[in-house]
């Protein structure tokens, strides 16, 4: 008899807790999240210039080397600025 009473009380307790949890979840507001897209400044995403070699002499090769080096430095600068911008955006959140 005592065993049946304990089982009955446990069953009632479980049912009560289940009902309470269902009632509590019904009272919450629905949370919606809106993604925020942050894009880097357009100056940092400009495509890099790739000058084709059209020379015929060793002098033309030297001139081309100067051009290619300048282009490479500009692209490296864009990448550096982009990395700085990413780090600032992460720190701002």
Swiss-Prot record:
Keywords assigned: Membrane, Transmembrane, Transmembrane helix
Subcellular localization, as worded in the UniProt entry: Membrane
Topology of this chain in the membrane: Single-pass membrane protein
Primary site of residence: membrane
GO CC terms in record: membrane
Transmembrane domains' residue ranges: 11-27
Taxonomic superkingdom: Bacteria
Pfam family, one: LysC
Record protein name field: Uncharacterized protein HI_1413
Organism annotation: Haemophilus influenzae (strain ATCC 51907 / DSM 11121 / KW20 / Rd)
Taxonomic lineage from the root: Bacteria, Pseudomonadati, Pseudomonadota, Gammaproteobacteria, Pasteurellales
């Amino acid at each position: 008899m005592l065993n049946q009473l304990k089982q009955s009380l446990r069953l009632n307790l479980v049912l009560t807790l289940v009902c309470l949890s269902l009632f509590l979840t019904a009272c919450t507001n629905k949370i919606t999240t809106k993604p925020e897209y942050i894009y880097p400044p357009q100056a940092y995403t400009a495509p890099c210039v790739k000058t084709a070699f059209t020379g015929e002499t060793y002098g033309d090769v030297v001139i081309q080397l100067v051009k290619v080096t300048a282009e490479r430095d500009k692209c490296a600068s864009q990448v550096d600025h982009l990395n700085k911008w990413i780090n600032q955006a992460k720190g701002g959140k």
